């Protein structure tokens, strides 16, 4: 029986909205403080975003934005924004094992896949299980001229959790790793910071110094019911929580 397609962008990391790593801190912002690049994209969506209504509600969105993150930029984000690091690390590990059984995620404290039922169908594990051999190949070959690409998703695939990421590309330039990702749709409050952390964890498994991670955001958006919460976050409210839109 076909599974109902549900977009991953709001659902992917509901734990992010309720959990933060004990090692993460929130940096309050003042007129003199420079926002990290993730918070800058939130500010840009608030300031310049257009309005649209879809089946899940009203959003403020921007098209074809780009985040280019150096190791220093990543550190700024991880130190200045709460991320459920342990759970996201466990989740990526299960993805890369190709684990489709939702119960296995519950066993490590991850319950945001429960709505999918017992099995993840043509979702992240289906594609991320290709990552370990790809990483091994990169580490073995280390070819500057080779583009190593992991494709995610298929337009017509039957799924109960469509990946937001469409591809992740690994390139080597002057002995340094350059990671590029294309994200077809990105919930800026819930999915985006978690995707940034997942990409960082992938990069750490490659035996090369990281030069940059670039995210190409085809559609990055904030749901209307999270706009005020986003403003509070940017004002330094460390207790802000975001609504899940499904």
Q: What does each model-found stretch correspond to?
A:
Residues 9-246:
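Terminal, non-catalytic protein-protein interaction segments that mediate quaternary/complex assembly
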